């Protein structure tokens, strides 16, 4: 039987969950499942309820059941990935987030972000850079994603590609010394030495103890910086 979202029992279960009465909501959802057996939405809601109580392994099983019943359930894949990430099952989480991105009309920007983050942790630099590139297109204002993207570009000696996210970060977080240092590294890699000097000096203005910027400036200006 298809779930009737006007059903008073469904409305009551949702009200209990949304008001934080998770134990009672659990019982209400389990009763609702007897009325609407094998309903993917109810299993999804049970997963959400378990997640809210910190029962991550239980939530994982419930999201998996929801996906089994509805293989294109993008939100269930996303929440499954979040749970797997939180319990340290990074490879499984990565697969769940990647699945979200393949489902038509269910692309979830945060799934791309998490996929990039996991790839960073797993050392998959190329895949991580691709993920953060994609995320930047839909959420260009994310400072954390832009920072990771810039780090990856510098690590891969893709200095020109690092300039844009770093310039944006420098404009939006002007007192973040690390960003100015990284921007200096990018300019240095492109042999734009005058711009690099400006960036390293700015990094030192913010953080006078930055030995990396001092070393770079000494190399560029033949002047010891202390």
Feature names for model-found ranges:
Residues 5-41, 45-52:
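Alpha-helical segment of the N-proximal tetratricopeptide repeat
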Residues 35, 69, 103-104, 138, ...:
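Structural marker of alpha-solenoid helical repeat scaffolds
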